[in-house]
């Protein structure tokens, strides 16, 4: 989140106090990223730096009592940033954040399986290599 913000012209600042642990995040559930959410959800936070000023074109879609920009989005460019960790067990509905990102925003199909990846890779390699060793 900080790298994207800095790269796109926003400002990152160091917090007076580190935010660590499961924290209530106030979210904008009209965002595609938070579709199906209540207004307040618990997510694991682990950071010292935070986004102080969002880049042009971004809007705030989540904040905590000590982090003014815990989630931001630029729907025109299809860019989303979150300060928290949806992938860990103590983030309530973290899996839903990931699903919303993959299926609603990125439009992934959800039918990918490792065995088809392996089979497709072997087939492509055989076609490329042919009889060469």
Predicted regions: what they are:
Residues 1-4:
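Local cysteine-cluster metal-coordination motifs and their immediate loop/turn environment
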Residues 6-133:
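RNA-binding accessory domains that recognize and position tRNA/RNA substrates
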